[in-house]
């Protein structure tokens, strides 16, 4: 009877061990619909990269860099082509400087990893352009708005002819100054007509003829298969040599301040060690971003003494402990004024 009683006990033990093993494997291997976000890195935009090239290079104007630092801040986040396990999520949740977020809050449902990468690269390109425009305007440099090709349909008649970034000067020999002007000029044609564009591409003027086809939304309306947005023309050439794995829109403010520091009549930053975050529009408005607490942590880790916080993010940092001075900014103009006051020992500087 003792022998027959041992078999259920043995099998119960084995079954329990298997259940525990399966639970452990599930904890380690089964992906869950969350991502982890943690402090990333900072990059001093007034320095050079690992190849010795300036992070931001401005040609065509006299420039300065100074002794100070203007650091952009980043977060590290689970990649779009990777999945977070429950164990990894638990570890991240227990760490004070990490966040665990719903995956769809970061990566739109239905978008492939390749599409997400393309979206983020496009946002970085747009942020670089808008930062340049905002900085040059703030420094008193002339900037002209022009209609610009922002996308070309691979199936449209302009494919291989017009290119994203082309600034449109004329349509059918007549100057155009806005997106609306280009649309009106194309709509004057009938389907099958040829539209002649004069565009500025990489400082070269090109004349390009495109035959219209039927619009997808109205078969009787002519179309050339491009998306037109507002672009900008200015004298200097601005080149970004920021590490290629940094993408997204949130470095706009830091890039704009760095360009302003280089081209403005007077030294803005001096020897200050500044970090910051925030998207920026061409007219200089600062936009709130995600991951503000992680960015504050990484900025302090890398030695920043002042951190520029978008006004829209102040509510996200209540309770954050830091030795840095947190300065609230709503615009590039605000940021410039605050830095000038700090250097002058002034008071009344906005803070979160």
Describe the predicted segments one by one.
Residues 1-11, 94-102, 110:
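Terminal targeting segments of Actinobacterial cell-envelope proteins
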Residues 11-31:
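Hydrophobic membrane-insertion alpha-helices, especially the h-region
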Residues 39-64, 73-80, 100-153, 215-236, ...:
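PDZ/PDZ-like peptide-tail recognition elements
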Residues 136, 158, 165-168, 197, ...:
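Terminal peptide-recognition signature
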Residues 158-181, 296, 303-305:
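Conserved PDZ fold ligand-binding element
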Residues 184-228, 318-344, 348-352:
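PDZ-domain C-terminal substructure recognizer with occasional recognition of PDZ-binding tails
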Residues 262-264, 274, 282-307:
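Glycine- and Gly-Pro-enriched alpha-helical subdomains that act as flexible
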Residues 308-319:
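Short, glycine/polar-rich helix-capping loops at beta-to-alpha or helix-loop-helix junctions
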């Amino acid at each position: 009877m003792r022998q027959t009683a041992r078999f259920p006990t043995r099998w119960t033990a084995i079954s329990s061990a298997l259940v525990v093993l399966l639970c452990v494997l599930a904890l380690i291997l089964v992906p869950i619909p969350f991502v982890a976000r943690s402090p990333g890195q900072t990059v001093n935009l007034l320095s050079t990269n690992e190849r010795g090239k300036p992070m931001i290079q401005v040609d065509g104007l006299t420039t300065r860099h100074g002794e100070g630092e203007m650091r952009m801040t980043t977060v590290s986040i689970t990649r779009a082509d990777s999945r977070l396990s429950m164990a990894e999520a638990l570890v991240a949740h227990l760490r004070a400087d990490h966040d665990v977020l719903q995956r769809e809050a970061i990566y739109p449902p239905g978008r492939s990893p390749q599409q997400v990468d393309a979206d983020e690269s496009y946002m970085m390109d747009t942020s670089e352009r808008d930062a340049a425009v905002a900085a040059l305007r703030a420094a008193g440099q002339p900037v002209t708005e022009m209609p610009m090709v922002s996308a070309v349909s691979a199936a449209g008649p302009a494919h291989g002819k017009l290119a994203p970034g082309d600034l449109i000067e004329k349509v059918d020999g007549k100057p155009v100054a806005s997106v609306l002007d280009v649309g009106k000029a194309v709509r004057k044609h009938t389907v099958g007509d040829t539209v002649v564009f004069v565009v500025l591409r990489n400082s070269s003027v090109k004349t390009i003829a495109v035959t219209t086809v039927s619009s997808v939304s109205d078969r009787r309306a002519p179309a050339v298969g491009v998306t037109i947005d507002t672009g900008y023309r200015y004298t200097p050439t601005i080149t970004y040599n920021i590490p290629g794995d940094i993408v997204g829109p949130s470095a706009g403010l830091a890039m704009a301040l760095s360009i302003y520091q280089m081209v403005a009549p007077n030294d803005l930053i001096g020897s200050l060690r500044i970090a910051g975050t925030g998207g920026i529009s061409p007219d200089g408005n600062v936009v709130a971003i995600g991951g503000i607490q992680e960015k504050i942590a990484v900025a302090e880790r890398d030695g920043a003494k002042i951190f520029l916080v978008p006004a829209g993010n102040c509510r996200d940092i209540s309770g954050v402990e830091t030795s840095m001075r947190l300065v609230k900014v709503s615009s590039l103009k605000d940021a410039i004024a605050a830095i000038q006051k700090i250097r002058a020992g002034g008071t009344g500087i906005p803070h979160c």
